[in-house]
A protein has these predicted regions:
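Short, acidic/charged, Gly/Pro-enriched secondary-structure junctions
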Residues: 95-127
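Polar/charged alpha-helical tracts
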Residues: 4-8, 14, 100, 150, ...
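Intrinsically disordered, low-complexity segments enriched in small/polar residues
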Residues: 14, 23, 41, 64, ...
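Beta-strand secondary-structure signal
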Residues: 81-85, 117, 149-153
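Solvent-exposed strand-to-loop "edge" motifs in beta-rich extracellular domains
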Residues: 87-89
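Solvent-exposed edge beta-strands and adjacent loop segments
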Residues: 2-85, 129-145
Length: 169
């Protein structure tokens, strides 16, 4: 499903106030990162068959001990990551891209893509680049659904603030 399809009829409210569930977050990826000017509305939504989406900031810390002051910790950065778990669904554009031969066995820039991650209630989130790491493209016991385990990890510059707007390049 394309992001533009998901957002049809949805209008985020910038001043939304209330409880938020994990289902209120949208993760969409560029399925054609080698093509210039892919519209964000054409990104593939990562949702079909996904039971778990664990968004982490993974702080990077430096710990030092100083005379008469003891230990001090300083945050020097964050490593954004997304852990995806769920069941394989063939025919879903996002899953088919993530689990393609080129991504599973690719390295370097060959597994890098753009992403947006935002809250559907207020449209606010972030935009950046991630490396796709496929840990498992199908596992489970006889008679069970074929499970997948994938990580997206930030690469390059920190993500930038993003607010959803239809048809943005």
């Amino acid at each position: 499903m394309k992001l533009s399809e998901l957002m049809t009829g949805v209008t985020p409210e910038a001043d939304y106030e209330g409880w938020v569930t994990n289902d209120d977050y949208v993760l969409a990826i560029n399925l054609t990162p080698n093509m210039a000017n892919t519209k964000i509305g054409d990104y593939g939504v990562v949702q079909m068959g996904i039971g778990g989406l664990d968004a982490q900031l993974n702080p990077i810390m430096v710990d030092k001990t100083y005379i008469r002051a003891g230990q001090s910790s300083q945050k020097t950065g964050s490593q954004r990551s997304f852990a995806l778990s769920g069941d394989r669904y063939m025919g879903d554009e996002a899953q088919d891209y993530i689990l393609s031969h080129a991504i599973k066995y690719g390295t370097g820039n060959g597994v890098v893509t753009d992403y947006v991650y935002f809250n559907i209630l207020n449209g606010k989130g972030e935009k950046g680049k991630v490396s796709i790491i496929v840990n498992s493209d199908g596992s489970g016991n006889a008679g069970e659904s074929s499970a997948l385990d994938v990580e997206f990890k930030k690469i390059g510059a920190n993500p930038v603030e993003y607010t959803y707007a239809a048809d943005t390049p």
